[in-house]
Each structure stands twice: as C-alpha cells, then as structure tokens.
C-alpha cells in the first residue's frame, strides 16, 4: 500500500474520531464517499500504527516538558459508550501484596462496562504482554467467540504494548486509553478492584500464587452472581449481562404493587416505579442522543 493511500486512510480515521466515529464507521463513511483503496483490516492496522506513533510523540513531549519544567499538552479525553453487553470491555492490573516488602502478585481482570460483569480474571507473578493476550483469548472464548467493539485501558506498559494492540485490532477491536495521571478515566474496573479489596474476606497479604488465584476466583463468582450492584439497580452483573434481570424486574413490580396496595398511607399517592438498569454506560460520554 502506497504512502499516499496510508496517509489518506489516516486522515479519514482522524476526521472520523473527531466526529465520533470509530475505525469501522470512518471506513464506511469513506466508502460512501467513493474512497475504497484498502480493506477494513488494513484500516485497523493503520489505526494501530497511528496510535503507536502518537503515543511515542506524546511520551517524548511529556519527557521534554518535564526536563524543561513545562507542562505537556493534555491528551484528548477518551469517550466510549455501551448500550448493551459485550460492546465495551475495560481492563486493568492490580497488585495483591505478599509477605515480602515490594513484592506483589498481579491480578488481571476484564469487565463489561454495561453489565459490570467480570468477563475473566487471572493472577500472575508479574505483568506481561503474553499473560494479557492469554487473558483476552480466554475472555473471547468465555463469551462464545463474541468480541467487543472497544477495549479501554489505562497507560501501563502492557496496556500499550504493540503485540497486544495488534492482537486486539486483528480481532476488529478498537483500543481506547485513559489520559496520563487521570484517575477517573477507567472507573468501572477501578471500582471492581476496590470491591475486591474492601471485602471482609480479603486477607490483605497472600502467602502464595495459589492462594491469591483462589481468592480472586471466589471473588469473581460472588461478584458476578451474588453481588447486588448499586450501579445496576441492585441486580447482579450476571443478570444484567444475560438479560435475566427483566424476569426479576417483573417480579419486583408485582411485589412492590402488593406492598403499595397494603400500605397506601406510606406512599402519599406517589407510586414509585421499580428501578431498572440504565440503558447505557459510558466513560466520559454524555450518553446516546
């Protein structure tokens, strides 16, 4: 593919991102406008290359600014939106302390931001691209081959590794990253990690990799199937993920109506509806129009 075609594709991708389009959307728009010089897979490869180049430039800018005592130009705020399960996954790695100072096991996890379900989690001795790729292969298999439209992560070395990003883009997945040093750009997975570490059963220190892996596996099962999450109207993540919350919602409506009929004086004429999970979830996104 010629450099001029690559440049035009990169221009379409950049313009599409400004207009709220992902890579596939920009490809379709260009196609509608009569530009068809490369396959969608090639567009994904070019998009990944552009991101890597931008990351290199941004890192150099940060380093130069730090040396000169100047403030680096802020990265554009990421915006992702999900209106259903398996549209957007977020992932991260957190430390699980051991008895040795400065030594921690690494817990990897992927969460669906719409349903809050932990798709898959694992624990390893260290952070590595190979383990991250294995995590995503396991997640895709766990969802019956379904892949998300977007994967969001922070700016860790593994999260920005070329091999991982090429693996994701090869599966047609758009990659999104938090801004450097912005703590609330990856809120869903951070919230899940806080839940993991704030439970009464959390040991605080892990004696072995097996112990850490066992704790995380037990936590994920509880979190997905028994944790009535306040962010999804007190349904479990598994119920929202597979849609079974709707059956329970109908039951809740019947129970509430019965309660209201027995005690009308407690409602003063106001009949509150049964809360349902929001129709969308996002990161720095105002919501669907």
How should each PLM-predicted stretch be described?
Residues 7, 27, 44, 117, ...:
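Generic structural signal for individual residues within well-ordered alpha-helical segments
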Residues 1-88, 182, 238-253:
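Basic, flexible linker segments flanking DNA-binding modules
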Residues 36-37, 76-222:
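RNase H-like DDE/DDD metal-dependent nuclease/strand-transfer catalytic core used by mobile genetic elements
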Residues 169-171, 195-289:
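C-terminal domain-tail junction helix/linker
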Residues 19, 23, 57, 146, ...:
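Short, polar/charged, Gly/Pro-enriched helix-capping and turn/loop motifs at alpha-helix termini
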Residues 14, 31, 48, 140-141, ...:
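A general structural signal for alpha-helical elements within enzymatic catalytic domains
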Residues 53, 69-70, 96, 116, ...:
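General alpha-helical segment detector with a strong preference for membrane-spanning helices
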Residues 43, 47, 136, 223:
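Conserved active-site tyrosine of GNAT-family acetyltransferases
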